[in-house]
Amino acid sequence: MGKKYTESVKLVDKNALYTVQEAIELVTKTSKAKFDETVELAVRLGVDPRHADQQVRGAVVLPHGTGKTVRVLVFAKGDKVNEAQEAGADFVGAEELVEKIQKENWFDFDVVVATPDMMGVVGRLGRVLGPKGLMPNPKSGTVTFDVAKAIADIKAGKVEYRVDKTAIIHVPIGKSSFGEEKLSDNFHVLMEAVVKAKPAAAKGQYIKSVAISSTMGPGIKINPGKVLE
């Protein structure tokens, strides 16, 4: 472990449960790398992801974005090609893009949007896009005829969240350079979305644990009972 990491760890009491404000203040102090570190939120939920009725998945536009340039690939035909290009899509196409991905193992994009009529074509990529979390999905607003709005939302800082096999959601909420106020705004918008997405089948405590960390910094635990304060 580097000297900077060791210094950062000293600032954090690993047994403490901090308030949101304290944690965000600490995450900016413990971000000491030479690059602008990403701040990530990890939320452990009281759900069993093996059951279809306990899946937690959705998308939300963070008020201050993530600080990351997002490359958008759109599968569309006809008029929707122009609409996607005008809205700022980085790549637009149909079968030829499917072939490019299959043959060249090409993944120079971060989000995939598709019009519903293209899902038959995109479905052929399920095995390669699925494991990377890139498969378009109506729940996250990436399967839609309104491609202009989908692209605008993504470029504005829309993030997808979904519970993994261990019932944890990992989502970036910005860069350490954002400062406390912007990180706090993004944190609250995301947590409110996750709380609203609670499945009816989930029993007991829903928000089990919450932590934030910068790319190279230690994890900072937040009191799960105070995340919406």
UniProtKB/Swiss-Prot annotation:
Biological process (GO) annotations?
regulation of translation; translation
* Molecular function GO terms recorded: rRNA binding; structural constituent of ribosome; tRNA binding
PROSITE patterns of this UniProt entry? RIBOSOMAL_L1
Q: Do you know which InterPro entries this protein is assigned to? A: Ribosom_uL1_bac-type, Ribosomal_uL1, Ribosomal_uL1-like, Ribosomal_uL1/biogenesis, Ribosomal_uL1_3-a/b-sand, Ribosomal_uL1_CS
Q: Which GO terms describe its cellular component?
A: large ribosomal subunit
Domain of life of the native organism: Bacteria
Alphabetically ordered keywords of this record: Repressor, Ribonucleoprotein, Ribosomal protein, RNA-binding, rRNA-binding, Translation regulation, tRNA-binding
What is this protein's function? Binds directly to 23S rRNA. The L1 stalk is quite mobile in the ribosome, and is involved in E site tRNA release. Protein L1 is also a translational repressor protein, it controls the translation of the L11 operon by binding to its mRNA.
Query: PANTHER family per the record?
Result: 54S RIBOSOMAL PROTEIN L1, MITOCHONDRIAL (PTHR36427), LARGE RIBOSOMAL SUBUNIT PROTEIN UL1M (PTHR36427:SF3)
- Protein family: Belongs to the universal ribosomal protein uL1 family.
What NCBIfam families does the record point to? rplA_bact (TIGR01169)
Q: Describe its assembly.
A: Part of the 50S ribosomal subunit.
Its name, as the record gives it, is Large ribosomal subunit protein uL1
Organism for this UniProt entry: Clostridium botulinum (strain Loch Maree / Type A3)
